[in-house]
Amino acid sequence: MDRIIEKLDHGWWVVSHEQKLWLPKGELPYGEAANFDLVGQRALQIGEWQGEPVWLVQQQRRHDMGSVRQVIDLDVRLFQLAGRGVQLAEFYRSHKYCGYCGHEMYPSKTEWAMLCSHCRERYYPQIAPCIIVAIRRDDSILLAQHTRHRNGVHTVLAGFVEVGETLEQAVAREVMEESGIKVKNLRYVTSQPWPFPQSLMTAFMAEYDSGDIVIDPKELLEANWYRYDDLPLLPPPGTVARRLIEDTVAMCRAEYE
């Protein structure tokens, strides 16, 4: 439940509006509320990090509003909490009125939800499940450059899970649609909340089965097999894509060195 910020309140401050994050001096604000002109605003505690509270403040600032991507190099847990704050702020902003009856809604006191004051409908933050998969063929890994990433970064394949589809089916479909190949021996690795805008990445490793690379030009600029010791520019550390690539490289080193 949110409350009014007092002078001595302290912690990490996720100040967000319209999926933007306030980053004075390029950093996530930390310290006493008075230092950031937050006293008197409403705040909701959304977690803790290193024993300090993490607060969400739904507010637009005139300057230094940026993307949560700018704090991706933070500790993984703090980055996740910043992402949670941005997603919750957008959820509360976009769910002021009920989609069924049009009446005003109010936040739940017990969970991340909005409740309709008229028809009692309950809304939760939208989470979009996605798959991301590293595909290995002998001593090489399949890496692609996506159309939305024109900075030279090559990464593994990923995509959204469709309605009525299992995660395993989503992997097979996305890989076939984007690269034209089939995979086998699928293995779950880990997951990562990814607030761009509200994804939950489920990470897998797989082995090449059959087929030649035929890219979907709407999704990819190019895709190729890269030997584990001769890789192109990769996603930054801290991303689940980077972990999948590094895990695949480690497996190749164990077998080929």
From Swiss-Prot:
Its EC number is 3.6.1.-, 3.6.1.22. The keyword Endoplasmic reticulum does not apply. It catalyses: a 5'-end NAD(+)-phospho-ribonucleoside in mRNA + H2O = a 5'-end phospho-adenosine-phospho-ribonucleoside in mRNA + beta-nicotinamide D-ribonucleotide + 2 H(+); NAD(+) + H2O = beta-nicotinamide D-ribonucleotide + AMP + 2 H(+); NADH + H2O = reduced beta-nicotinamide D-ribonucleotide + AMP + 2 H(+). A motif (Nudix box) lies at residues 159-180. Residues 125-248 form the Nudix hydrolase domain. It comes from the Bacteria. The keyword Acyltransferase does not apply. GO terms for biological process: NAD catabolic process; NADH metabolic process; NADP catabolic process. Its cofactor is Mg(2+); Mn(2+); Zn(2+). PANTHER family: NAD-CAPPED RNA HYDROLASE NUDT12, NUDIX HYDROLASE, NUDC SUBFAMILY. GO terms for molecular function: magnesium ion binding; manganese ion binding; NAD+ diphosphatase activity; NADH pyrophosphatase activity; RNA NAD-cap (NMN-forming) hydrolase activity; zinc ion binding. This is NAD-capped RNA hydrolase NudC. A divalent metal cation 2 binds at E174. Keywords: Hydrolase, Magnesium, Manganese, Metal-binding, NAD, Zinc. A divalent metal cation 3 binds at E174, E178, E219. Divalent metal cations. Mg(2+) or Mn(2+). Substrate binds at K25, R69, E111, Y124, Q192, P193, W194, P195, F196, P197, Q198, S199, A241. mRNA decapping enzyme that specifically removes the nicotinamide adenine dinucleotide (NAD) cap from a subset of mRNAs by hydrolyzing the diphosphate linkage to produce nicotinamide mononucleotide (NMN) and 5' monophosphate mRNA. The NAD-cap is present at the 5'-end of some mRNAs and stabilizes RNA against 5'-processing. Has preference for mRNAs with a 5'-end purine. Catalyzes the hydrolysis of a broad range of dinucleotide pyrophosphates. The lineage of its organism: Bacteria, Pseudomonadati, Pseudomonadota, Gammaproteobacteria, Enterobacterales.
